[in-house]
């Protein structure tokens, strides 16, 4: 395994399931996530980007511990309405949201069912913004405007960077809370559990990816 340090991040390059991989923790927020993704593409020539993490549920049917696999992602805090753009639309971009790779999404859903059969898996839009959503008003806004299933702080930036570079991507989120400030278990406990599930899930996806 080789470790590369750049932009205050550590990139671990090696082999998993017979595939060359680079594992990195981007840090919190959209800027960190976008920088991390661009480094993966520029320096490590990533052919696929898979991001795992946690998110808050925006759907009454999606409970803590469930998994949301992205169909597409959007910036819920992007607002250029004054210039004639709809909420969420990035000015001068041809995409309103960034669509995940269909093949990766199908692999992930199947892998979730096989690796964690007791965990519910949902496919839907994930909304990202540079804020931790614990306010009902913000939650209602994101649901009404975008119909998102989950909300977090990095996914859309990763998706945008990958989209601009024509690199297939997927975002997978374990639900840690209801995006209303509530939680059924303490965060460190959930984080450890989610990390273990994400690792097993990623291994299975890697095993099934062709090439």
Where are the language model's segments positioned?
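Alpha-helix C-terminal capping segments
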Residues: 39-43, 61-62, 160-168
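Mid-sequence, gly/pro-rich, charge-dense loop/helix-turn segments that line enzyme active sites
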Residues: 58-145
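His/Asp/Glu-rich mid-to-C-terminal helical/loop segments that flank catalytic regions of hydrolases
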Residues: 179-211
